[in-house]
Amino acid sequence: MTVRESAARTAAPSRGTWLEHEPLAGHTSWRVGGPAERFYQPADLDDLVQFLRALSPQEPLFWLGLGSNVLVRDGGIRGTVVCTKNRLRVIEARGPACVYAEAGIPCAHVARFCTERDWVGAEFLAGIPGTLGGALAMNAGAFGGETWSLVRRVLTVNRGGRTIWRAPEEFEVGYRHVQGPEGEWFVAAELELAPGDGRAGRERIKALLARRSATQPTHQPSCGSVFRNPPSDFAARLIEACGLKGHTVGGAQVSLKHANFIVNSGDATAADIETLIAEVRDRVALLCGVWLEPEVRIVGEAQA
């Protein structure tokens, strides 16, 4: 028995979902990606803690939320994928204008929860197509707001299953960047809002979503923005200036609606998308002298 086989057998959770060779195309917003060697969805936070305590320290781990902002290669992911989608969804009020939300909660749900209680400041979260855990991990933002501007404190878990409350000061936070203690993952956060007009907040959410629908390819599989905006410019402007709107590789296409989106036209592979990302980056570098940094994470094994 290999180390990984042993890890899989000893760590199989008692209450969560445990699958082997689970195709990840159904768990990513691009609708591409090979299989996870092992795939685990916790029943709740306590189940996750028990799972990690039983897991071999040699077992590779990858954390997945709604599967946006990530490109899983066609060969899939070795080790165990911990998927919080539709799990870790507890959300509750914690005192005046403070919300506790677990990592698997969609950002849009957090925004609605707050405005329903006449708390404002989180409306921009409705424009982030991912979970709170993913938003915390990269300081996701939309429409001028950034996730960590709301954070009072975060709850992390380490490989040994220990949960730790940490203050924002313990992290290096920047534009689409968060760095903290090694070997810990976000499982919840307390967010601080401001008392306000919930009805007006809901109207702002409605307006933001209408703007998003008008400017982004929301009805096609994508990961959200592919590249970070360079200083004092916009990735979409540079890509469009290079004549790349509509450019395709296989089933992957630079969106005709928003140049910083790559969409799956129906039959794209992860390899198509990765090749298109590289072609766009190289063309912008050649014609504009700007090296675009990917916002999307590219993970997993290439197809053998």
Curated annotation (Swiss-Prot):
Q: Which GO terms describe its cellular component?
A: cytosol
Q: What does this chain do?
A: Cell wall formation.
The primary gene name is murB
Compartments reported by the entry? Cytoplasm
> What general EC class does the enzyme of this chain belong to?
oxidoreductase
Organism, by scientific name, is Methylococcus capsulatus (strain ATCC 33009 / NCIMB 11132 / Bath)
Q: In which pathway does it act?
A: Cell wall biogenesis; peptidoglycan biosynthesis
**Cofactor(s) needed by this chain:** FAD
Report any Pfam family annotated for this entry.
MurB_C
Q: Which reaction does it catalyse?
A: UDP-N-acetyl-alpha-D-muramate + NADP(+) = UDP-N-acetyl-3-O-(1-carboxyvinyl)-alpha-D-glucosamine + NADPH + H(+)
- What are the alphabetically sorted keywords of the record? Cell cycle, Cell division, Cell shape, Cell wall biogenesis/degradation, Cytoplasm, FAD, Flavoprotein, NADP, Oxidoreductase, Peptidoglycan synthesis
Per the UniProt record, which EC number(s) apply here? Answer: 1.3.1.98
MF annotations from Gene Ontology: FAD binding; UDP-N-acetylmuramate dehydrogenase activity
**Every FAD-binding PCMH-type domain range:** 31-196
Record-annotated active site: R176, S225, E295
Q: Which InterPro entries match?
A: FAD-bd_PCMH, FAD-bd_PCMH-like_sf, FAD-bd_PCMH_sub1, FAD-bd_PCMH_sub2, MurB, MurB_C, MurB_C_sf, Oxid_FAD_bind_N
Could you tell me the Gene Ontology terms of the biological process aspect for this record?
cell division; cell wall organization; peptidoglycan biosynthetic process; regulation of cell shape
Q: Which family does it belong to?
A: Belongs to the MurB family.
What is the protein named? UDP-N-acetylenolpyruvoylglucosamine reductase
